[in-house]
Curated annotation (Swiss-Prot):
The keyword Phosphoprotein applies. Interacts with the CDK4 and CDK6 protein kinases to form a serine/threonine kinase holoenzyme complex. The cyclin subunit imparts substrate specificity to the complex. Interacts with ATF5. Interacts with EIF3K. Component of the ternary complex cyclin D/CDK4/CDKN1B required for nuclear translocation and modulation of CDK4-mediated kinase activity. Can form similar complexes with either CDKN1A or CDKN2A. One of its GO terms (biological process) is negative regulation of transcription by RNA polymerase II. Gene3D superfamilies: Cyclin-like. This is G1/S-specific cyclin-D3. Regulatory component of the cyclin D3-CDK4 (DC) complex that phosphorylates and inhibits members of the retinoblastoma (RB) protein family including RB1 and regulates the cell-cycle during G(1)/S transition. Phosphorylation of RB1 allows dissociation of the transcription factor E2F from the RB/E2F complex and the subsequent transcription of E2F target genes which are responsible for the progression through the G(1) phase. Hypophosphorylates RB1 in early G(1) phase. Cyclin D-CDK4 complexes are major integrators of various mitogenenic and antimitogenic signals. It comes from Homo sapiens. GO terms for cellular component: cyclin D3-CDK4 complex; cyclin D3-CDK6 complex; cyclin-dependent protein kinase holoenzyme complex; cytoplasm; cytosol; microtubule organizing center; nucleoplasm; nucleus. GO terms for molecular function: cyclin-dependent protein serine/threonine kinase activator activity; cyclin-dependent protein serine/threonine kinase activity; cyclin-dependent protein serine/threonine kinase regulator activity; protein kinase binding; protein serine/threonine kinase activator activity.
Amino acid sequence: MELLCCEGTRHAPRAGPDPRLLGDQRVLQSLLRLEERYVPRASYFQCVQREIKPHMRKMLAYWMLEVCEEQRCEEEVFPLAMNYLDRYLSCVPTRKAQLQLLGAVCMLLASKLRETTPLTIEKLCIYTDHAVSPRQLRDWEVLVLGKLKWDLAAVIAHDFLAFILHRLSLPRDRQALVKKHAQTFLALCATDYTFAMYPPSMIATGSIGAAVQGLGACSMSGDELTELLAGITGTEVDCLRACQEQIEAALRESLREASQTSSSPAPKAPRGSSSQGPSQTSTPTDVTAIHL
């Protein structure tokens, strides 16, 4: 007798959405109460960090996003890793030479929490071109856990998407597309420090608003949609409108940078690089592929 294994997919099966859970206002209110606990209180570039600058964080964020995309991580892994990164940097002065090591550790921790099969230390070392050793990753994993007080179950913007979409009652054939576009907006927001101190619920609501309006997924006017979304998460209408405008502006800037990158000549591969290794793309795929 011969056995045939047909498990070709890397992702484990997931349970479908639970209407009772999504419709229970107590669950949403609990998330709203907890979210402030995981938001950095002040700009750490002004108060804590001396060597690290905003553009360094952005470069690191794009690298982390590329790693998560190439490894086909769950959508929540990257923004959760950025949450760990911001919380750590808001309390611990860090040298710029340690920044990639910190980013790799944050991805490792986030994947352990949100992935069925987490990223491995060996694979993360390869993505750093072996600038980071397995021993360093293990040591810093314990260090970061201690500084975060082992509080890793952070509330992030992705946690609100299903609850907001459930209350919008969009056409079934549009829900998945709106969610995908909103997830792309959330990844974009995670790369931009401007949004680091925004409540996750506001970022999620603004992302869904931008996606719905861009796709023309409902018949409501922009003001009506904004008021409805603001009522779902208890956000002030003016604040939500400003957040959505910032998200749309960030998308336009990202697309402009992507078009400039694609029109410039491709850089030569570093000496000794192999085409079999992890790809070194310079722009997140989902962001450049979106058309609103």
